[in-house]
Amino acid sequence: TVVVESPCDWVILRLLEAAEVRVIELPLLPGGVIDLQRLESLLESETVRLMLLSSVLSMPRGTHLPLNNQQAVAHLLGRHGTWVLENDCYSELHEGNDAQRLRDWLDPDRLLVFSTFEKFVGAEAPFGYVLSRHWRNELQRHFLLRAFRLSPIRQKAIARLLGGGRLDQHLLILRRML
């Protein structure tokens, strides 16, 4: 069983559905806050193996978890030994550089972090990453297999964008527009 914050990206929901994973949606309260009582109730009544949460920004609302809510959620999940899959796809769109990411409060041994460049560069940059302390070799193998299917020209273009600081300039403009 996987608990996801709701609203949740429909692509993620479809992937979980395709993998025949049981999904329980946990609606966010106004302001993007997680209902701690409801979460604790779910963790006690269900066999929750994984919780999918946003790192900084929760889309499509554009809200972020207040610091005290982040810490309380992390404490609850740690107490129950629940793995967390942190969606870091929209963090770069947050205005401030001082935003605390949820992973700052989580047990790194029960954490996976994923993100993509596609959300802020565009569909022509279908590149992403997954971070994990435990599955590094397996994840690296999967990413290498996928890399051979992607155009080397695209890979070089993204590398130049990242290496030349142009991505940071692009993000500044994008944040102002949002």
Task: Please give the residue ranges for each predicted region.
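Active-site phosphate-binding strand-loop segment of PLP-dependent enzymes
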Residues: 32-95
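Conserved PLP-anchoring active-site segment centered on the Schiff-base-forming lysine
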Residues: 1-10
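Structural motif
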Residues: 3, 49-54, 85, 113, ...
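Short beta-strand->loop structural element characteristic of the AMP-binding/adenylate-forming
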Residues: 22-30
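Conserved core segment of the aminotransferase class I/II
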Residues: 107, 112-175
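Short hydrophobic alpha-helical segments of the AMP-binding
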Residues: 15-16
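A short helix->loop->beta-strand "cap" motif at the edges of active sites that frequently abuts
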Residues: 21, 77-82, 108-109
